[in-house]
Amino acid sequence: LPALSQPRHAPHDRRSRRRAETRERIFRAAMSLFAERGMAATTVEDITELADVGKGTFFNYFPTKEHVLNALGEIQLGNLAAALEDARDGTDPIAEVLQRLARALAREPGRSPALVRSLMMAHLSNDAVRERVVDVLGQGRGILAQILRIGQERGEVRREADPLVLARIFQQTMFGTMLFWSMHPGAPLPEWISQTIGHYCASIPAEGRSRAGRRP
């Protein structure tokens, strides 16, 4: 009967959805444990127990526990890609695009000061993690530079500034803010980020532009 018919691709879609849900569950379990114990003290067994999956299932998605952080990198690169689309759309000033992006980038780390500390330690102490972070930061810097270049083309960002340098300063501002917040938590991380990135945005407008970077 037509009412009971399913599209031919539906089983594949369901499998894909289940795989995505399982991967998300493993990722969330790992992030929770990294925040609680640190990455070094967390085992794959700990993660699979909390995620309620078998070790074989874990290794279907991640070769090692360190590779779980790849998922975080994917999330952040997705946030950057979305911001680039916003910038190309041209509806909002670049300063607002950057502010939204900063809040989006802070969303995952902002779940816990302990998580930020754990991630920072992993970046510093694990070569595989550090290499992946360097790669993600490089990709992110390239996307940020494209966003800032769009701002320059619109006359919203200083043309004499190198977009890649401005992108690096944006990343440094984000990292520094997250590190300080992790040591002195109080207000939510997005509030810290809004303040510091607000100062960043106030420093980059082209001469004669308003602090908000709005076009006339």
Show where each model-derived region lies.
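Basic, helix-initiating cap at the start of DNA-binding domains
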Residues: 1-37, 41-53, 66-67
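An amphipathic alpha-helix adjacent to DNA-recognition modules
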Residues: 20-28, 40-41, 52, 61-85, ...
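Key DNA-contact positions within bacterial/archaeal DNA-binding proteins
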Residues: 56
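Hydrophobic alpha-helical connector segments
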Residues: 71, 82-114, 163-170, 190-194, ...
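Amphipathic alpha-helical packing segments from all-alpha helical-bundle domains
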Residues: 78-81, 111, 128-154, 164-168, ...
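Short alpha-helical scaffolding segments that buttress acidic/His motifs in well-ordered protein cores
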Residues: 105, 119-120, 170, 174, ...
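Amphipathic alpha-helical segments used for helix-helix packing
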Residues: 109-130, 146, 179-183
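Hydrophobic/aromatic-rich alpha-helical bundle segments in the mid-to-C-terminal region
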Residues: 130, 152-198, 209-216
